[in-house]
């Protein structure tokens, strides 16, 4: 059984015996326990289990104790460390020198013992050795007997832990390409060096004929298929057929295609993670899957010109339920856009919520909207907005039909209930695919995302000579008047899922205007997640040594390793590039 990645907590202490160390043992170990309790009571793994922490077997005052801690952590699948101390310790003697995992240090802000002095000293050692570490120091002085973790310290500890866990969850997993390059899209030209060196992942690939092989040879669970077909007939609404008359398929052919796309979903899932039922059916090799944390399906054009498209498969893999009930989503990229798949993966591992995959299709200016509809934009839409619309698939959680405190949300599967599942299905239909684009047919996904949801749009790009670069845009979904929505939506494909998005503007750089956001976006796709998580993404990017070329996150929320400040404190964007370039990828 594969262990969850864990956070290692290292209580460091002044090594002087005969009074000094003894007086600090309880306080120091209590700091470690309080950090472990904070993380385990607040954060969850993608499967819903509480995050696990491992505390060093003793406080660490000298090198042998640091070594003992290191050995324990190696056996315990520790993916990151947090060192805590209320006092002076011996910097390079007590530090964790693992170069391939993130490190953070919390130095207690008190007056009796110099925790801040140790923090500064050990961070200097980390900087000299080229092993980045995050420094955490509370704003306000605390009493020596105060066991509470201040709110500003909590925020940094949790931000660090979320990002560090993401690095651990990615390590030693795989990206699975189903097919190859779709329509010349750069993101589907999969770069194995990027996955290996930056994420610690491997790449696997299967030809799309694997789907037809498994269908023809019955390499799927026939009992599940019958159950799935019954559920789809009862719960999934076939939408209006927008095709011109000569392209409309017969009822008999549409029914056959429903069976086909259900099998596509089952096979796509089994390819990613395996299925023990296949071994019972005599297919032991296929039963193990590909250990894929994220995958993509080429589809266009070789598959979709002949077979039903992948929209149903992609939609339900990214959705948190199917005929087997509520479950965690799979991260799955349209058109095998591996870079958008990784963007979705970053978002998912930080939030445990499903992701919207979308084309960044159109910038609508206030003037253009008024010209086309006669409507004057107001509120969050006043400066214009972006039309996010994928060519036929999207997680049903993207409807915004789940709620929290009466507001639309996208939330982890363990918070979802059956009434929210039904609301998503009721507010979605599946029209026959546009056969001018998808000659083989299939069924697309059509819904409108509810407005007023805080969301973050993300994209990872590869820049020749630099490597991966991340861009982040926080903003809100919009709810337009119904007639305005229909007028604008019908100018594209009315059978596809739509999200209206207004990025938060800052008045400078790429966020001077909504047009500038669109104009600076690095690719045709974006990954959209619930919540404003830009600060967490920046922290994660720094751990992976991926520079961020545009974002609208407030400066006070940016949390990177301490040595980033030695690359410059005025132009943080340039300093980020220099730090990432000098340090190189995390797993190289």
UniProtKB/Swiss-Prot annotation:
Organism: Streptococcus pneumoniae (strain P1031)
The keyword Protein transport belongs to this UniProt entry's keyword annotation: no
Functional pathway: Carbohydrate degradation; L-fucose degradation; L-lactaldehyde and glycerone phosphate from L-fucose: step 1/3
Chemical reaction(s) catalysed: L-fucose = L-fuculose
Protein keywords: Carbohydrate metabolism, Cytoplasm, Fucose metabolism, Isomerase, Manganese, Metal-binding
Protein name listed in UniProt: L-fucose isomerase
Enzyme class label: isomerase
UniProt KW Transmembrane helix keyword: no
Similarity comment: Belongs to the L-fucose isomerase family.
A matching Pfam family: Fucose_iso_N2
GO biological process: D-arabinose catabolic process; L-fucose catabolic process
Predominant location category: cytoplasm
Single GO term (MF): arabinose isomerase activity
One GO CC term, this protein: cytoplasm
Catalytic residue list: 335, 359
Subcellular location: Cytoplasm
PANTHER family: L-FUCOSE ISOMERASE
């Amino acid at each position: 059984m594969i262990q969850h990645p864990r956070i290692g907590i290292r209580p460091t202490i002044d090594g002087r015996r005969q009074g000094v160390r003894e007086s600090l043992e309880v306080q120091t170990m209590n700091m470690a326990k309080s950090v472990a309790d904070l993380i385990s009571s607040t954060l969850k793994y993608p499967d819903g289990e509480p995050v696990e922490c491992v505390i060093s077997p003793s406080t660490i005052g000298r090198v042998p104790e640091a070594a003992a801690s290191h050995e324990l952590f190696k056996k315990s699948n520790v993916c990151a460390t947090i060192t805590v101390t209320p006092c002076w310790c011996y910097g390079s003697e007590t530090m964790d020198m693992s170069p391939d995992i993130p490190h953070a240090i919390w130095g207690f802000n008190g007056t009796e013992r110099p925790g801040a002095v140790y923090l500064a000293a050990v961070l200097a050692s980390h900087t000299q050795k080229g092993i980045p570490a995050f420094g955490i120091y509370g704003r306000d002085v605390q009493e020596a007997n105060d066991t509470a973790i201040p709110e500003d310290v909590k925020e940094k500890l949790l931000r660090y832990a979320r990002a560090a866990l993401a690095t651990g969850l990615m390590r030693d997993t795989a990206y699975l390409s189903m097919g190859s390059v779709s329509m010349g899209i750069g993101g589907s030209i999969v770069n194995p060096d990027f996955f290996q060196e930056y994420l610690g992942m491997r790449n696997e690939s299967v030809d799309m004929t694997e789907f037809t092989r498994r269908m023809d040879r019955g390499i799927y669970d026939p009992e599940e298929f019958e159950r799935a077909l019954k559920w789809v007939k009862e719960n999934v609404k076939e939408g209006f057929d927008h095709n011109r008359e000569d392209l409309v398929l017969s009822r008999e052919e549409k029914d056959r295609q429903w069976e086909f796309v259900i099998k596509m979903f089952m096979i796509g899932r089994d390819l990613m993670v395996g299925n023990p039922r296949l071994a019972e059916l005599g297919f032991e090799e296929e039963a193990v899957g590909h250990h894929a944390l994220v995958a993509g399906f080429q589809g266009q054009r070789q598959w979709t010109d002949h077979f039903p498209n992948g929209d149903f498969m992609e939609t339900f893999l990214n959705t948190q339920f199917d005929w087997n009930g509520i479950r965690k989503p799979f991260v799955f990229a349209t058109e095998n856009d591996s870079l958008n798949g990784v963007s979705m993966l970053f978002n998912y591992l930080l939030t445990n919520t499903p992701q919207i995959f979308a084309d960044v299709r159109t910038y609508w200016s206030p003037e253009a909207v008024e010209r086309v509809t006669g409507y004057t934009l107001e509120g969050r839409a006043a400066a214009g907005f972006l039309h996010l619309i994928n060519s036929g698939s999207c997680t049903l959680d993207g409807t915004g039909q789940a709620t929290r405190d009466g507001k639309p949300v996208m939330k982890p599967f363990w918070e979802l209930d059956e009434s929210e599942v039904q609301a998503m299905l009721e507010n979605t239909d599946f029209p026959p695919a546009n056969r001018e684009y998808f000659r083989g047919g299939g069924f697309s996904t059509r819904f409108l995302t509810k407005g007023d949801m805080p969301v973050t749009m993300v994209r990872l790009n590869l820049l020749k000579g630099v490597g991966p670069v991340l861009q982040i845009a926080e903003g809100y979904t919009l709810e337009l008047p119904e007639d305005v929505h229909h007028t604008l939506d019908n100018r594209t494909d009315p059978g596809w899922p739509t999200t209206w998005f207004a990025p938060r503007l800052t008045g400078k750089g790429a966020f001077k205007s909504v047009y500038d956001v669109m104009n600076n976006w690095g690719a045709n796709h974006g990954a959209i997640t619930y919540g404003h998580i830009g600060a967490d993404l920046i922290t994660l990017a720094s751990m992976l040594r991926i520079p961020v070329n545009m974002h609208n996150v407030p400066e006070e929320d940016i949390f990177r390793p301490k040595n980033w400040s030695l690359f410059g404190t005025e132009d943080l964007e340039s300093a980020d590039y220099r730090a990432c370039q000098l340090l190189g990828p995390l797993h190289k």
